[in-house]
Amino acid sequence: MQEWLKFKGKKWQQIIDVDDFILNNYKEYKGSSDFLKGMSRRTNKVWARCEKLIEKESTISILDIEDSYFSGIDNFENGYIDKKSEVIVGLQTDEPLKVFVNPFICLDSSLQVVKNNGYRFDKDTVNRFKDFSVSVEDIIEDTYTEDIKKFRRLHVIEGLPDNYGRGFIVSDYRRIALYGVDFLIAKKLHDLDRLKKDINYSIIRTREEVVKQINALNDLKSMASRYGYNISRPAKNAREALQWLYFGFLAAVKENNGASIPTGNNSPFIDIYIERDIENGILTEELAQELIDQFVIKLRMVRFIRTPMFNDYFMGKTPIITETIGGVYNNQSLITKTAYRFLNSIENLDVDSIPNFSILWSNYLPDNFKIYCSKIMLEHNVLEFLNDDLTVSSAVTGTSGKSKIGKQIDYYGGNCNLAKALLYSINGGLDELTGEPVIEGVEPISTSNLEYSKIAKNLTIVLKKMIDIQSDYANIVHYIQDKYSYESIQMALNDTVVERYITFGITGLSTLVDSLSAIRYSNVLVKRDENGLSTDFQSQDKFPRFGNDLDEVDKIASDIVKLYYKILSTKSFYRNAKVKLGIDSNGMNVIYGKNTGATPDGRFKLVALPSAANPTSNVDNSGLFASLKSILKLPSKVCTNGIVTTVNITPGALGSKKTESVENIISILDNYFENGGNHLELNILEKNEMLQAFNNGNKYSNFVIRNSGCAIKYCNLTSDQQDSLVDRTYHKVL
C-alpha cells in the first residue's frame, strides 16, 4: 500500500495494532531542544484571529450559539478561522467558538442557557426532537431513588454526568490515520457478524452499539468530505495523519459535551510520519512545528454550553482536553522530537489551559527532555506529571486516571464528601445544616467530648451507606447515558470488546483525617444548637496534622482510604465494570465546602474543603518534602485512579539561578516518583501573584495555574473557587 511505504512491521498491517506500528517505526530522541522553530507566518495569522475572539469571549461568557441545528457529527456546515492560512481544518460548528446544544444529554437546561444569552432556538427543531426522543436529564431524575435525590440535594455525593456528557473516554483517533475509515468499518462489520451465537441481552445490546458505531464512522467520512478530504483511506503524509486524527477527535466533540475529552498519546505516532516526510524532503522543521501548532489551536477552540451547576463541579469553563506525552517500552522511552514540538506550542502560542499536557515521568526519560519540561514549568504553570506505568499506549483520561488507548474505558462515578461523612457520624446520621435524617443506624453522640472509638465505629456505618448510594447512583447514570446518549464515534475507535472500569473519587480527605487526629490526640469539645446538632468545635490541645510527615496522623489517612476501597470493592457495577478509586476533587471541594458545617479540625462552616490529596491549607508547615512524604504514605495500590497532588512553591525555594531551579524541579519529580508517587503538579509562584490576578482579573486573562489535575485560566473561575486557590500553602523551603 502506497500510504505505508517505508513503514516497518507486519502484524499491524494485518490487524488493528497501533502499538506494534509505533514500536516498529518510531525513533527515540535524546537530544536537546535546539532544533525547535517558532511560529510560522500562517500560524501567526490564524492565532491572531483566535486571540481576538477569545478576548471578546471572555467579556461575554459565550461568543456565539448555534440556534438552528442540534449536535451531531455531520450536522454543521464547514467552519474556518482563516481558510487560506489553515493547514489543519475543521471546527465544531460553522464559526470559531460557536457552541451547540446537545439535546440527548441536557436539552432544557441548555435551552435556558441559550435564552439567558439572548438567543432563541428554533422551536420546530426542539419540538421534533421531543416528539421522537428524550434527553438524559429529562428521564434520569425519574430513575433515582429517594436516597440518591437526598444525597445529591445535601451535597453528599455529586458530580456524576446526569446533565453533561460522560467524557473521560480515551479513543484511538490514530486508527483513522493509519488504516482509513473503510478498514475500520470492515473490522466492525466482521465483529458484528461474529455476534450471532447464543443471542442474549448482552449480545443484542452489543450488536446495536456496533451498528451505531458503523453509522458514526460513515458520518465521520461524510463530515471530512465536506472539507475536501477522503479519509476512507490511510493518511499518506504527516499533514494528512494529523488531519485524519483531528477529524476523529472533532467528531467526538460534535456529539458530546463531556467534562473531559482526552486526545490520547499522539506524539510518537505523528512523529513517525513527520520523520518520514522530512527524510523524503517534503517537510521542513518549520512546517512540522506549524502542523503541531495549528492542531493545538484547534483544540483550544473547543467549547461547550455549560450550566451553572457544571461550573460549580468543574473549575474553568473549558473542557479538560488532555494530551499525554511519554511512555516506555523495553527500557526505552517514547520521547520523540514531536514531544518537544507539542510543548513548544506553549512557547509559540503563549500559555493556555488547553491542552492539558500530562507528562508520564520515569527514569527512562532522556535527561534533555527532563530539563526542557522543567524549563517550561519555571515559565508556565501548565504541566502535570504522572508516574509512568511503562506501557506503550497509555493516556490520561482527565486528571490523573489512565487507560490503555482503544482497549479500556472509564465510567466516572462521582465524588463523595468525606467531611459530611464525619459530621453524620457525630450527629447520629442527621444532616448538620438541615437537621433532616440521612443515614439510619448511627448512634447519636450526646457528650460534649468526642470519643475516637465511637466516632470511628459510626464512620464505618456512614461510609457503607454512602458507598451503597454512590454505587446505585453511578450504575443508573451510566445505564441511562448508554441508552440515550451513547458515544458512537468514540466507541467506534475502540475495540468492540473493551475493559470497562468505573472510577470513584473522594473529596475532603485531609479534613476528615485532621479531624480524626484532633479527636484522638486532643480534647475536642462540641458546640451544639437547640436541636443537638454540632455547630462548632474547640480543640484544647495541639494535634498532629496531615502533611508534616507524622506517622500517627498519616496512618489515619491511609486507613481511611483502605477502608473506603474495601467497602467499594464489594459492590457490583454496570456492565461488570471494575472499580478504580482516586483521591481527587475536580473542583467539587469548593461546592462541597460551601454546603458543609464546621469540622473538628478547626475548619469553619461553609469553607471550601482541601483539594484532592492536598493537606489542609497552611497547616503543612514543615516544608515541601515533608508534605509530599505524607502523601506518599497513602495506599497507591488501591488508588488506581490516581492520587492528585497540587503544590505551590515560591521561586526562591527552588534557587536563585535558573539552572539551580531546573535541577531542583527534576530532583523533586525524580524522588517523588521513585518513591511511589502517583501524580504531581507544581505552581511556581508567589502568593502576591495570585492576589494580583484576583484583584485585577482583566489584566490577567492568560494567567494559568494548576489545580486538581487540570490547567485552569484563573479568570474563568468563580470568586469562591479563586478564594480557595489563593488560600493555599506556598512552600518557601523544600
Model-derived regions, located:
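Conserved catalytic cores of very large enzyme subunits
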Residues: 2-734
